[in-house]
């Protein structure tokens, strides 16, 4: 058959309904559909899984034991499949040694460049350090103008105290007649009386030369003698000119600072040859932070001002503090901030050798009765962190420590030798600290000597290409020194995308998961250009995406639907964007054609007149900004990628509120002051972290509805007859659960060189409960049947019971009606976990003074899901709460009551407030990139509403 198509027959992974799909090869193909409709099941669990499996199966059994063997996806056949590479959103390494530079492998090229064309400069006196052969030294002298007078000196003593009598005797024995001592020429026959308490420099005059063409062999002999006597150093003292220093080592001829031979590993902070000896190549050091140890300085010592010694966890340290303060006369009923400096120092750093008598009896009768030195809370935390063998204790102590820049390497991670080598006047650490856009400018403008340019040309090409790829996927604001663990999922994915573009492969099937996440519309245009470039190399790109611009730029769209979960898994439309837009049954098509759209709000809420004000925010790239966050409104923070949105909201505002309201120990980013916190009662951070880390956590347990369901089953007649209580219906405790699988429903079978296999438990057949428990039914369904219901099915089933129905309805309201109540939390995506948290907030009693923070809640959402999400957020705001979100999606941005737009650019070019106000006001600000993209959307939607039929 023709090789221009990938043909899938009978795909049944997860909720796919035995579908047949034909995808054109060497095209940009978007798979879209509602959240949970089966997009990822088709793209990742079918296409990628089969492409990867076929490759792994071609390897030997020995190799497979290291790679693992993937299960064959549930599909009849796939024809025309290429080798598959998945570029997903899973964040990169959590290793603190991984940086953007190491992940992209640009660091390897930088290290090679500095090793091959770098020029060592002595950090002590600024003298160039070079390694030269005798032939190079002779060539250098012969390039001087003819008749130039000079003398060849051998520096045998450099800036050393002493009389040096043995040195002068040695010079006489060698047969030399002249010597230069502290800059003055003397005859060796003179008697030298040097002050032994002063530093002296002694240089032997090897030869006096007038430069002319026939003196090459004489110069050779002179330099060899000079180098032999001094251990590798020589000076050409040009009469009437500057002296020329020579060395056959990489060492400073003045102070002796040694670099050694330049090798790439010298410039690696992960190698002992290059790493800073103080921080071991991390660039940071952990220090106990007073602000974390005493987070609320208005508290007294008796009230628990010292967080690590809080009486909640143990009475030992509070009792020790009490007895120490009594005997050292430190008041415990005075706010910490009002204690004298001396008392604060004693509490923090100890009693400086003074002892106190300590008597303590624990709950088990153990007695400690000693005269002890009070060590202070900071010393105590530091000691326990470094001495403990317990991971738990180390994690607890780590909460009171902060990462400070290493003062030895100033955060560059490398030792003095590596940082002394310059290319273009800069060391490798300084260049790695530049934003990628500026770094690209540095290498484009780099001026090198003719010889160095020949060596550097291929290296520079690789560096420039890779930096350009990163810039083109919207990452110009990042630095190569940025730690990989601080990257968002979208940033990590785009870094891998740039790496793949740099590989220049063709004939590959790339599968991407929402690469537009975290990208402003301005940066998204560049990303689409990069995707097209990969396609034009002869690759097939399959992108799971909801972004309208990406869909319109695609060659082909596959729309999966019509609903989510059991209601999805079918192909609703497939074709070019124009063909899909004409499809009546495709929800995506209706949004593409404009027949369906998210309407503008009828009015913008004015809020309650109160606000939270942050002044002097200066963390990362924030430029000492003052920001007002109005309360009782739907507030959206916008700005191009890297403009400072996450820094402002997550690192400053969220941590300030968490510290003041929740007594959280996490240190906020730099700011001067905060006001207005008294106007809110509760901070709720709804992020995309998992709702549970074990398969036993599920939507029913997280939302709390499972407690109500277990109560209901315990009240049935059958349960009462058998004496079953609520605990009988838990799969976490003995009694009602299946003991063969301990309530997991599955068993793990280890398979040597094959991956572990998980099979349903043969006793309970995956139902998690024993047969006696499953005999108890409510309306013909047992507890396992209920856990297999989707939220939508469960709403109908529990219709007569308001307490259960209300909680389940919130799951449907946030677009999770397709999720099964017993679905393991580990299988939920980040977006699903975030909406699960939203749902659990909706059914709580609202005080009207909650402050909700969400970071990009539209991740993984179709336009129809976004419409539903906006409705949910509106419900929270209508109840009097404040919702603050970071978002790029223009449907959400246009629905806000108030916008805070940061920028104007990313990285160093950002960090200021470009515009604030309603979407209409921001759209009129010419300097705002958000406003430029928002204005046509507002105009389009007003026109749509004007022509839409009356409801």
Swiss-Prot record:
GO MF, any single term: zinc ion binding
Function of the molecule: The UvrABC repair system catalyzes the recognition and processing of DNA lesions. UvrA is an ATPase and a DNA-binding protein. A damage recognition complex composed of 2 UvrA and 2 UvrB subunits scans DNA for abnormalities. When the presence of a lesion has been verified by UvrB, the UvrA molecules dissociate.
Protein name per UniProt: UvrABC system protein A
Any one GO CC term of the record: cytoplasm
Alphabetical list of InterPro entries matching this protein: AAA+_ATPase, ABC_transporter-like_ATP-bd, ABC_transporter-like_CS, ATP_grasp_subdomain_1, P-loop_NTPase, UvrA, UvrA_DNA-bd, UvrA_inter
Quaternary state and interactors: Forms a heterotetramer with UvrB during the search for lesions.
Matching PANTHER family: UVRABC SYSTEM PROTEIN A
GO biological process, one term: SOS response
Alphabetically ordered keywords of this record: ATP-binding, Cytoplasm, DNA damage, DNA excision, DNA repair, DNA-binding, Excision nuclease, Metal-binding, Nucleotide-binding, Repeat, SOS response, Zinc, Zinc-finger
Chain residues that bind ATP 2: 639-646
Protein origin, superkingdom: Bacteria
Protein family per UniProt: Belongs to the ABC transporter superfamily. UvrA family.
List of residues binding ATP 1: 33-40
Residue ranges annotated for the ABC transporter domain, each copy included: 309-587, 607-935
Gene3D superfamilies: ABC transporter ATPase domain-like, ABC transporter ATPase like domain, ATP-grasp fold, A domain, P-loop containing nucleotide triphosphate hydrolases
Gene: uvrA
Zinc finger (C4-type): 252-279, 738-764
Source species of the chain: Lactiplantibacillus plantarum (strain ATCC BAA-793 / NCIMB 8826 / WCFS1) (Lactobacillus plantarum)
NCBIfam families referenced in this protein's UniProt entry, alphabetically: PRK00349.1, uvra
Main location: cytoplasm
